[in-house]
Amino acid sequence: MSTTSVQHFAPSYPPFSSGLSSNRMAQSQTPGLDTLAEGSQYALEQLQLSREAAAGDTTATAASGPSDPMSKSKDPYDFDHHNHNHHNHHNNNHHPNSNSNNSLPGFKNPAQRDPLAEARSAIRKNSSSAPVRRRISRACDQCNQLRTRCDGQNPCAHCIEFGLTCEYARERKKRGKASKKDLAAAAAAATATPGQPNENPGKDSGTMVGGHSPPDRRQELNGRYDPAFDAARNLSGSAQPQLPHAEGPGMVGMPNTQHLPSPSQPPMGGGLEGLPMNGYNGLNDSNRPPIPVSELQSLHMLHSSNPHPRSPPSILPSQRYNGGYNENAYSLMNPQEHNPTPMNQFRLGNSTENPPNTFLGLSPPAQSPGWLPLPSPSPANFPSFSMASFSTTLRYPVLHPVLPHIASIIPQSLACDLLDVYFTSSSSSHLSPQSPYVVGYIFRKQSFLHPTKPRACSPGLLASMLWVAAQTSDAPFLTSPPSARGRVCQKLLELTVGLLRPLIHGPAPGETSPNYAANMVINGIALGGFGVSMDQLGAQSSATGAVDDVATYVHLATVISASEYKAASMRWWTAAWSLARELKLGRELPPNTSQTRQDGERENDPDADPSNRHSPSLITAMGHGPGNTVINVTEDEREERRRLWWLLYATDRHLALCYNRPLTLLDKECNGLLQPMNDDLWQASDFASASYRQAGPPLECSGHSMFGYFLPLMTILGEIIDLQQARNHPRFGLAFRGSPECDAQVLEIARQLDLYAQTLKEFETRYTSGLALGAADNDTAMEGSHLNHVSPSGRSSSTVDSRVNESIVHTKMVVAYGTHIMHVLHILLAGKWDPINLLDDNDLWISSESFIAAMGHAVGAAEAAADILEYDPDLSFMPFFFGIYLLQGSFLLLLTADKLQGDASPSVVRACETIVRAHEACVVTLNTEYQRTFRKVMRSALAQVRGRLPEDFGEQQQRRREVLALYRWTGDGSGLAL
């Protein structure tokens, strides 16, 4: 084969590797494009070597071409014959002085091949039957997200192995910037009249069916045509007869799925020429096919700079593309609005992956544009084009509001699985959240997972639920590679914060009225969307949305509280408490009217269509807003409000002990609020069976959930904290500690603790002895009829006896936890909270009667901890709450071991051993720094009790004091909040 034609076009684009091209690459300042060019040159070099291997055969065939009509290939893919005949004729006409033996750097003459080339040629001839591994043109979305190897199939082998959803939905993008000529051509194509035909379609397109260009067209290239590139283009002609743009080297054969014609988009006249790729373009622009107008569909919707909706949109921004995404180049618009509002209102900073992306997870990260050097938004941004597909594959329709935001973070199937994880119970007998970050169920599982009529939820709440579940889920998507969980959780956290609009609870973007800004200013005071002044002309936020915001704050605060950043969690807890108080969640809503609703549904029908629930603003519902105050609120919404308040009430008291702070939510704010329902009745939506309920903070143990056994303890803890704050008051504390009022409060709190202990024993008898003797058949039937949280397989495989045994074990575990916390509250009531003050013992409290009583409760708490380890070895029942009570119940044992050392009683030694075991289990389940630290301190003290005194005994005691001094419960101490 003569190389004259190849040599002639080498100055425009040398496709093969050589010393000259290598030097040019070394001097390039664009390493990303260097990689692309080198990979493309390798592919083209392999193509050239294969041609050289068959040079002898093709020369003989070409010589007989003019005389033998059968020598011409009828197959468009037989490019060896086609290109050889055509380009010899081309070179003979235009270059009479050219020598076929001349060669340029980067090209090899077939007559002067080196031994390496001949060896490669021989290898390729001998291995022609073996499959050649080729680089795939595109990886699926899952493999691209996980950065794993993909085979390009649908579904691919990796997704089949791990059970993932294999999709190719992300936008195709390429690097490089557009030339001025192409930018002008794009603008001209956008302003062309729709339906205007081309005057000369054959001339404009420059292509024929099958991807070939006519001979006269190729002769017009005048030295800028590369036959190897054309051969590679022809290889993909059957799968893609007409390429929408000129693919760069190395990009040939890639299936272009993003440029499919849309029936909803009318064709527009004019074409858009392809774009050169930063010095690596080897084709003349005139040889590139036109861009069908259906290809411009996504750009047609991105007219952010066009103030007139009816005028032709400006597709391309005025500023040049300089390697990064411009923040204002694509403010995502709703194509149905005449005055669109940008969706990217909340930029999330300091993201390590794709920092300029302001789409809140809408565009796939770390991707390049498809055919323009500008970002193309994901199809999930436009509901009219993509949301229809969600309903066909989505298991839980409740996720619809958040799907556009998580499209590039997690697949839909994983989102549904995470929702299952959120509502998963660790027990089949009684509802108990399996996730350590779900401290109590606020919402009814069936209302979220209903296949046709789910609860209407805010995107922020759904994102926070997915984030909470992703912390502990064992899905392969989150465990392989090991960094996947951290990356996904970080993106879900940023998305949740962005959707929540922290501390700003006004109307969402796009829902404001024209005079919203004026309504945010009253009497010269800018209230700025903090929920103080809703739109007085009728724009009201729904009660469900308000509750969703508070629940989202709870999710954020809970996970952060369980981490090492406990002090930072108070910002989120404070926001949740403040918003709950503002929404008056501590008060019962007025009763519903007896009239039926307009849609004909019953008032408290739990299966009613949530889309027909017209919940008003809570300010209006409480009678503080204008308009009609006769509002119908479903029982689900009422119970959600109650449970959310009581959860915040309990965590307020729990965190007051953890962080040595006063209470935020007071008892007088919720004296008239009904106590939460039994969890099993709540999940079954059996409101009739829970008709009688007490109001106000509870004091008695009533159930297996945190609202049944833990909430009464938090009510008593709140009174102990108030008493402790009064004792330590800087001015009145000294007088109060010796007053009769203080003694009366101590006696009253002790009476409440005794009442709780009595109800705890009754609770144990009712659910253990009664079930074992068969005396509580009605209770068993009632409990079993409301276990909708158990999977069908679990119900089918469980027998009645196993269910009863599991219920007994669960009850004993609840009793053990309740007993331990009750003993710790006795210690807090009688003793000191600060470990350094205990060790110093400046007031000789260790010799008082109250110390002896407190020491008895410390031993009792350790015995209860042993029972807890028996029924719950990994302490997974309530890890979020249990740590601080285990710590406070251990301080007296540490004091005894430090003072008595070898003279300690056997019960104290056993108690210390139990505390060490419990702390080790806590570290495994919910690892926190203070638990690791105190475990080391207790081990050191236990070694001293057993008589193993180290040589540096004094130094070890000093180190123990320094460690304990980090956690102070004095006047200015912050407890666990370092």
Swiss-Prot record:
- Provide the leader sequence positions: none
PROSITE patterns the record matches: ZN2_CY6_FUNGAL_2
Q: What is its main location?
A: nucleus
Where is composition skewed (Polar residues) in this entry?
18-32
Name any Gene Ontology BP term: DNA-templated transcription
- Which residue ranges does the Swiss-Prot or TrEMBL entry mark as DNA-binding? 140-166
Q: Where is the composition biased (Basic residues)?
A: 83-93
* Keywords in alphabetical order: Activator, DNA-binding, Metal-binding, Nucleus, Transcription, Transcription regulation, Zinc
Keyword Metal-binding, does the record have it?
yes
- Recorded GO MF terms: DNA binding; DNA-binding transcription factor activity, RNA polymerase II-specific; zinc ion binding
Basic and acidic residues bias spans = 71-82, 214-223
Which superkingdom, per the lineage? Eukaryota
PANTHER family membership: XYLANOLYTIC TRANSCRIPTIONAL ACTIVATOR XLNR-RELATED (PTHR47663:SF1)
Described by its record, this protein's role is as follows: Transcriptional activator of the xylanolytic system. Involved in the regulation of extracellular cellulolytic and xylanolytic genes and in the regulation of the intracellular activities of D-xylose catabolic genes in the pentose catabolic pathway (PCP) in response to the presence of D-xylose.
Q: What is this protein called?
A: Xylanolytic transcriptional activator xlnR
Record organism = Aspergillus clavatus (strain ATCC 1007 / CBS 513.65 / DSM 816 / NCTC 3887 / NRRL 1 / QM 1276 / 107)
Gene expressing this chain: xlnR
